[in-house]
Amino acid sequence: MDTSHAIKSCVLILLVTLLCAERAQGLECYQCYGVPFETSCPSFTCPYPDGFCVAQEEEFIANSQRKKVKSRSCHPFCPDEIEKKFILDPNTKMNISCCQEDLCNAAVPTGGSSWTTAGVLLFSLGSVLLQTLM
């Protein structure tokens, strides 16, 4: 086996390993509570190993004005319709959604997670490197 072929094999194995490796850090979620829809929420690492990113949106009447607020967080489980039963006011509407991908609880979909970006960059680098070695 010549040196060129060995290097190509090592690079290919390294690329496959990096692209298939499980995420080393925890789930990334946005976190904020009861903020206006226009407000951006900072991201944080979910402390639960099998946690869920949760997006909650509430619409209610306060001082004769309709208001909309959002909350973003991480939970060890996905809240469901049971959570809504604690609201006694019939003028309040609440939507809850759960997901298990990085930063998936945004109000407006983002351009993708940092893992997607890293994967694309790594794949591009690997392609260039393989072409250079051939």
From Swiss-Prot:
Propeptide: 113-134
Gene3D superfamilies: CD59
SUPFAM superfamilies for the chain: Snake toxin-like (SSF57302)
Listed name of the protein: Lymphocyte antigen 6I
Free-text tissue specificity from the UniProt record: Expressed in hematopoietic tissue (spleen, thymus, bone marrow). Also found in peritoneal macrophages, peripheral blood leukocytes, liver, heart, brain, kidney and lung.
Keyword field: Cell membrane, Disulfide bond, Glycoprotein, GPI-anchor, Lipoprotein, Membrane, Signal
Extent of the signal sequence: 1-21
Major localization listed first in the record, in broad terms: membrane
Membrane topology: Lipid-anchor; GPI-anchor
